[in-house]
Amino acid sequence: MQHEPEDQTFQLQALEICEPDSSFDPQKPPESGEEYLMHMFYERKRCPAVVTKRSSKIRNNTGNTTLEMLDNPELPPFKCLLPTPEWRDEQVKSFQAARSQVLVLRKELANNNYDQSGEPPLTSDQEKWKEFCRNQQPLLSTLLHLTQNDLELLLEMLSKWLQDPNTTVDLLHDVWLARWLYATLVCLHLPLEPHVFSTLRYIARTCIHLRNQLKEDEVQRAAPYNLLLTLTVQVFAQNDFKDYI
């Protein structure tokens, strides 16, 4: 049997996304789902086939803390800050396309003896993780080192940073946090455990609270919150949040 070219097997996706051309800048952070997919194409060719066995878990400093439960948020004060149905559909398509790429890549790496339990990029120290996430893009060469358990714990850390009491979070300016949240959700294995849904719901409530603080004309600042809320409802089926989108 004749094997398909390697590049062709990686085209299984929900959207038609072009591979990076000569104008592609890998140092420029992605600003949309489509650009994130292009970065995935680029990163795919740089992922190692085999990595070493990890020596420790991330859980050490994260498993002993719990998320602060937020009250049920109020409905948005300005309807103009809500996403349109067309916008929501486009974001879901881009997200599902990214997930499809991750699934294909994981299968290919498994066929090449890729060890997903490889050493994580940092220690179990949450502050070092935060520093790393602030200064590095969420590349596949990093995220594919993490097991499902590690991804869940990373999502929990991100959700805590989203409601940091010592800073004023604005996902339009704190782009690093928005990108890591999106990329971690892309890489999560399904189905999810109940405690992961609890983390997702915490993130959704926080996004609603932050969006409710915006003024009527701050539509652009609402976009990152709308994206995470849309994914929570339309991808992860937390339908009781649908009134907020």
Swiss-Prot record:
It is found in: Cytoplasm; Cytoplasm, U-body. Its main location: cytoplasm. InterPro entries: GEMIN2, Gemin2/Brr1. One of its GO terms (biological process) is adult locomotory behavior. GO terms for cellular component: cytoplasmic U snRNP body; nucleus; SmD-containing SMN-Sm protein complex; SMN complex; SMN-Gemin2 complex; spliceosomal complex. Expressed in nurse cells and oocytes. Disruption phenotype: RNAi-mediated knockdown is late larval to adult lethal; the phenotype is the same if knockdown is restricted to muscle tissue. Conditional RNAi-mediated knockdown in adult muscle tissue results in age-dependent decline of motor functions, including climbing ability and flight. Keywords: Cytoplasm, mRNA processing, mRNA splicing, Spliceosome. Component of the core survival motor neuron (SMN) complex composed of Smn, Gem2, Gem3, rig/Gem5 and one of 3 almost identical Gem4 paralogs encoded by Glos/Gem4a, Gem4b or Gem4c. Part of a minimal SMN complex composed of Smn and Gem2 only; this complex is active in UsnRNP assembly. The SMN complex associates with the entire set of spliceosomal snRNP Sm proteins, SmB, SmD1, SmD2, SmD3, SmE, SmF and SmG, and with the snRNP-specific proteins snRNP-U1-70K, U2A, snf/U1A and U5-116KD. Belongs to the gemin-2 family. PANTHER family: GEM-ASSOCIATED PROTEIN 2, GEMIN2. Component of the survival motor neuron (SMN) complex that catalyzes the assembly of small nuclear ribonucleoproteins (snRNPs), the building blocks of the spliceosome, and thereby plays an important role in the splicing of cellular pre-mRNAs. Most spliceosomal snRNPs contain a common set of Sm proteins SNRPB, SNRPD1, SNRPD2, SNRPD3, SNRPE, SNRPF and SNRPG that assemble in a heptameric protein ring on the Sm site of the small nuclear RNA to form the core snRNP (Sm core). This is Gem-associated protein 2. The lineage of its organism: Eukaryota, Metazoa, Ecdysozoa, Arthropoda, Hexapoda.
